[in-house]
Amino acid sequence: MHRKRYLFFDIDGTLVAGGYEHGYVPDSASLALDKLRKAGHFLCLCTGRSEALAVSYMHQMGFENMISDGGYGITIDGKLLGIQPLPKDKVIRLVRECEEKGFSWGIQPDNSDTRLAPNGRFEAITHDRYMKTKVQPGLDPEAFEEIYKAYIACFPGEEEQIGTLRDLPWCRFHQEYIFIEPSDKSYGIKKVLELMGADLSDAVVFGDSKNDLSMFHDPWTKVAMGNAIPELKELADYITANAEDDGIYKACEELNLF
């Protein structure tokens, strides 16, 4: 009988190989998930994606539990318990500065697969395929009760011109723009463990990129993929193979999880 563990998996570059546009779940990763379930472990996706964009992965891979929105959204047994928004006043200040300095922007005021932008410039600059962009002339962030994410079109280095960014969490996944979104997966993991009545030492986390760094500082088992960034590998307890080279399966086998 295996000790019950609480396993938290990043999606892109961890469970899913092949990059954003050609992503696939390796057969060995699917097999590992099946064996982990049969061993009685608690499985949970842990992603920076919004719940609306990640829920299809959750169903596709047979998960019932998910931390979304960079640690601020929690789904247990298929039910979304809630999503904590960004501090609205700080987002408004960011948007105003971007307007003054000529940076195109978009916001996500609800849990959906669509961002709103005041004009077509954001899409023209980014040619983004990550999510839909709907143009809403006269868009004003003050008109919305909550804002979950924001997006600024800027190339690497240009973000240094935007002082209000210092007050908000942000990440860059694409050359053309940055995401202003929560980036504290550790926060979500601790919330889930608390709900489950589990200890921090019962958790095992799997990740590969910058937005996984927050979950690599706590006293639980930390697994970095072979394709992970160097900073993550330095914090890991175990470094496995690349996502496309059976990294998930090999790590679970090595850690005697099944």
Locations of the language-model features?
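Short, structured coil segments at secondary-structure junctions
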Residues: 61-62, 70, 164-167, 218-219, ...
